[in-house]
Design a protein with these regions (language model features):
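Alpha-helical/coil-rich non-catalytic "connector" segments in signaling and regulatory proteins
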Residues: 1-115
Length: 115
């Protein structure tokens, strides 16, 4: 099994950057899932790394805090968000929530595809 820190060191993924400071990067990654559904927690396997544009949260980033806490409990390896598409920057409360549980938030640069 690969770990998130190993995934982020793959040459084609080195442009992905950590958003929050208190993130545990030694989380196992079993799968990578792409989703835009707000009820994703019901449909993803444990130890997945989720990539998203966070379109469903553009009007209410507070819901991202709830998602982060749910994903952390699953457990999930982390959340990659393509900032600049629907959300330009994360609300500080979202980052604080992720930091409070050591949950990795990863920025996916706007010029990279999610596929």
């Amino acid at each position: 099994m690969m770990y998130l820190n190993e995934l982020l060191s793959i040459p084609t993924l080195q442009e992905l950057t950590l958003i929050n400071q208190n993130a545990c990067l030694d989380r196992p990654v079993a799968t990578i899932e792409s989703t835009e559904t707000p009820d994703v927690i019901s449909y993803v396997p444990k130890n997945c790394f989720i990539i998203t544009t966070a379109m469903a949260y553009k009007e209410n980033q507070e819901k991202l805090c709830e998602l982060i806490l749910s994903l952390d409990k699953l457990p999930c390896a982390g959340l990659g968000i393509k900032l600049g598409r629907f959300i330009d920057e994360l609300d500080p409360k979202v980052i604080q929530t992720a930091d409070s549980v050591g949950f990795p938030l990863i920025n996916i640069p706007i010029h990279l595809t999610l596929g």
